């Protein structure tokens, strides 16, 4: 695949809308604008990272201002601050990290979709209050945010980013820094199913959630099919059953059912479709970060070639729900890889990834913004930095 600098801009100019809204139903902004009209049908979006599941590396200053400096995760920070102080601190963060202006800006850049990572503790009835420490009050901000996005005509995916017990060890994206992954047992699956049922009710009964068309049932499970055997045999089929049971009880028309998203087989946790008996409105997700793939040679030519030819999905329909322009830590600030002196390469690599991912159902960049808005991890930063210029 030949990738030119102009290919990035051409791709963005011609593919501007999501597939699910045009396939299944029409959604419009509050003034009647259909962002998905006459589209090529690809999802093109951004993740709202660190809004409801804070990852300290994304915004270390904001993390410190919360009073969380030195803490690994939300769980650790709330335990340190105490519940009342943590609730007040996180409320300020929820009110300021992603605002209505951010949603307007996202739409202005030709994007059509947002993916919102949340933790199961968004439903506070599921928290073990004697042993789990998470901020309270986030749901009101989630509802408001979804209202803004729906008014703007954006499609919304809500992603269970932090699962009960933590789906992987020692990673802040689970909301805690657990020594071992504790999610893969029946009672934790049950808590997650209760979250999905609760979220499904909210989506179908509250106006602000009208553009939520997809629930992702767990983000990035362990990349080991032996560990995730019951995830595939138990949790995934029961997630379908739980969500459809609620929709049946609410008399939701089948065309208005939520899409139910699982990690694609290419992620490495096994085939999510293996035990499904009902895959109506099933969808799949894969995350592609060459930064952490030891099989890929760390060179510009290798990165371009890999991204052009990557087999990023084995199930259909699949969305590449996380990706970036990040490179390994040990080279990211060297002369050959610094972002602002290697713009030509990063533009070509962006185009290579987009062109590949749009052979599937589209992509969602990680993330919308970071503290420094360095464009390799901040889509907003690509506009602030002049990334889209077409000449050196």
UniProtKB/Swiss-Prot annotation:
InterPro entries: Glyco_hydro_5 (IPR001547), Glycoside_hydrolase_SF (IPR017853), Glycosyl_hydrolase_5 (IPR050386). The active site is at residues 220, 322. Its main location: secreted. The keyword Glycoprotein applies. GO terms for molecular function: glucan endo-1,6-beta-glucosidase activity; glucan exo-1,3-beta-glucosidase activity. GO terms for biological process: cell wall organization; glucan catabolic process. It is found in: Secreted. Pfam families: Cellulase. This is Probable glucan endo-1,6-beta-glucosidase B. The lineage of its organism: Eukaryota, Fungi, Dikarya, Ascomycota, Pezizomycotina. One of its GO terms (cellular component) is cell surface. Belongs to the glycosyl hydrolase 5 (cellulase A) family. Glycans are attached at residue 31. Residues 1-18 form the signal peptide. Keywords: Carbohydrate metabolism, Cell wall biogenesis/degradation, Glycoprotein, Glycosidase, Hydrolase, Polysaccharide degradation, Secreted, Signal. Beta-glucanases participate in the metabolism of beta-glucan, the main structural component of the cell wall. Acts on lutean, pustulan and 1,6-oligo-beta-D-glucosides. It catalyses: Random hydrolysis of (1->6)-linkages in (1->6)-beta-D-glucans. Its EC number is 3.2.1.75. It is an enzyme of class 3 (hydrolase).
